[in-house]
């Protein structure tokens, strides 16, 4: 006797009723890039078609469209006019992301604004903090990250997302926020972030490529599974409210491993290189793009992700509304 498993696949309605993993637009976070400019700017990135550097008005228009589609959250990255060795623009109370957060919350009070907390977009060397002897100083970087986090919390950001991969960054930030009265501001930590070649196109849009070396001394080795789990569990211990794995496609084993060891919400970042690959395949008619897109996003959830940060968020929202 054998089990006839095909019985439960015999019709579309039966398959739909028994589907274990379902996509919902509430799962998605849309990353947005705001550029400091006195002009109206909306620059499409050649390596990421459909992704733009936007000044304030186009950014607000994009938020309006996302809200109309049911997207509940955006993740902001800033592109300043001025960069220097210490990323001092990020410590200005009127810096580009702080201003954008204020404007978004004025117009769309229910839209969740998440701010990336790092210095690579603000430093002239493209590394994620203060340099000492051509290396990023962990503890000095924590000091300025805390200041940046406080400015963003004061500007009305709903969630802070430290992406710097400095040791102790979650505990240090949590203490700073709590001492300033921001006890209800959650931290979504980039808890397991790999030193990955999949980030290539992001550095085009954020103008954040390192001017020398790489980030392997602070971002994780992609060969390591146990260390990946340790990083996220350590951030949970330090007080992270949400954990994250970045990148996504080649790291679903890591997502599953962390999911099995934590009860915290788990985000996954579907990064620029992954986005660009699907877009290139679409351009050359190599795949059924919409089917592959929905399959990919469903597999992210099946692996254990509760939230999906993706440049495809708007496309997925449109597809889910149609279907």
UniProtKB/Swiss-Prot annotation:
Free-text cofactor note: Binds 1 zinc ion per monomer.
Enzyme Commission number(s) from the entry: 4.2.1.24
A GO molecular function held by the record: zinc ion binding
SUPFAM superfamilies: Aldolase
Keywords from the UniProt entry: Heme biosynthesis, Lyase, Magnesium, Metal-binding, Porphyrin biosynthesis, Zinc
One GO CC annotation: cytosol
Needed cofactors: Zn(2+)
Residues involved in Mg(2+) binding: 231
Residues given in the record as Zn(2+) binding sites: 118, 120, 128
PANTHER family: DELTA-AMINOLEVULINIC ACID DEHYDRATASE
Family (UniProt): Belongs to the ALAD family.
Subunit structure, interactors included: Homooctamer.
Protein name as catalogued: Delta-aminolevulinic acid dehydratase
Organism: Helicobacter pylori (strain ATCC 700392 / 26695) (Campylobacter pylori)
């Amino acid at each position: 006797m054998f089990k006839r498993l095909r019985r439960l696949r015999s019709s579309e309605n039966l398959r739909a009723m028994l589907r274990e993993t379902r996509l919902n637009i509430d799962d998605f976070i849309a990353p947005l890039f705001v550029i400091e400019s006195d002009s109206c700017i909306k620059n499409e990135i050649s390596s990421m078609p459909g992704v733009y550097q936007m000044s304030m008005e186009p950014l607000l228009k994009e938020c309006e469209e996302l809200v109309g589609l049911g997207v509940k959250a955006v993740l902001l990255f800033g592109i300043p006019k001025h960069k220097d060795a210490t990323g001092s623009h990020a410590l200005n109370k009127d810096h580009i992301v702080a201003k954008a957060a204020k404007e978004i919350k004025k117009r769309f009070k229910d839209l969740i604004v998440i701010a990336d907390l790092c210095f690579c977009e603000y430093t002239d060397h493209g590394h994620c903090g203060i340099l000492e002897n051509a290396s990023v100083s962990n503890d000095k970087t924590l000091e300025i990250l805390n200041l940046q986090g406080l400015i963003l919390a004061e500007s009305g950001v709903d969630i802070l997302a430290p992406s710097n991969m400095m040791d102790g960054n979650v505990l240090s930030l949590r203490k700073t926020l709590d001492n300033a009265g921001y006890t209800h501001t959650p931290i979504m930590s980039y808890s397991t972030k790999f030193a990955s070649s999949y980030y290539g196109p992001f550095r085009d849009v954020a103008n954040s490529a390192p001017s020398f070396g790489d980030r392997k001394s602070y971002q994780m080795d992609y060969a390591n599974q146990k260390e990946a789990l340790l990083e996220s569990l350590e951030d949970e211990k330090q007080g992270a409210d949400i954990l994250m794995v970045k990148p996504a496609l080649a790291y679903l084993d890591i997502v599953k491993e962390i999911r099995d060891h934590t009860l915290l919400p788990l985000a996954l970042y579907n990064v620029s290189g992954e986005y660009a690959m699907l877009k290139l395949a679409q351009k050359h008619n190599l795949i059924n793009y919409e089917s592959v897109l929905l399959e990919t996003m469903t597999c992210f959830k099946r692996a254990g992700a509760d939230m999906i940060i993706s440049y495809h968020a708007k496309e997925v929202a449109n597809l889910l509304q149609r279907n």
